[in-house]
Amino acid sequence: MQTTYSKFFLAGRTVHQITFDPATFTEADLLWLPHHEQLSSAGRKRKADHLAGRIAAFHALNRQTLPGIGTSGEPLWPAGVCGSISHSGSLAVAICQKKSLVGIDCEAIIAENEARDIQDGVVDTQEAQRLPQEAQRLAESGLPFELAFTLAFSAKESLFKALFPQVQTWMGFESARVTALTSDTLTLTLTCPLPPFVQNQAFTLHWCRIDAQVITLICDA
């Protein structure tokens, strides 16, 4: 599969990036992964996405090793390392560091009409538990609706990736709310306890835009 490696900085952290052409993927490419047999029943797109993400992770791990696949599909990082992987379209990103919360997500900016169709399943329009309406916060940001909505979607994905190693349970979009959104950061607040994390605990994420993609990152050293 044709790939190109690069890196950039977000929130002072190095993000490792792979751009790839899924059309050039072959089954033989997958043999590079020690766990390739676990992907034998996956579709072609899933295999290409997974491979690109693991290549990004390989660079994040100083080209020393590759994360395997956990029972819930999560990456298995080396002992003492926390990391995160994401892919969207022809872009894959990965980041890792020692013993901290870390979660990254990349998403293609969702078209406005589609965003409005699905917004009720992602953001809340009702006030609850003394937290402001998410829809109101997105509007107050001054960002175009489709960008603000995609950031909310992506940020929740990043947060859930970061919390999962400790929470070890499924989290819905309603588990966290956007309580602030600026030109480069976003704050999410938990709407319920997710032990060891508590209700109303807030997390700050950083974001950037690369062409038609957004990348959100939580990286709590």
Give residue spans per PLM region.
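Core catalytic alpha/beta fold that binds nucleotide/phospho-ligands
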Residues: 1-221
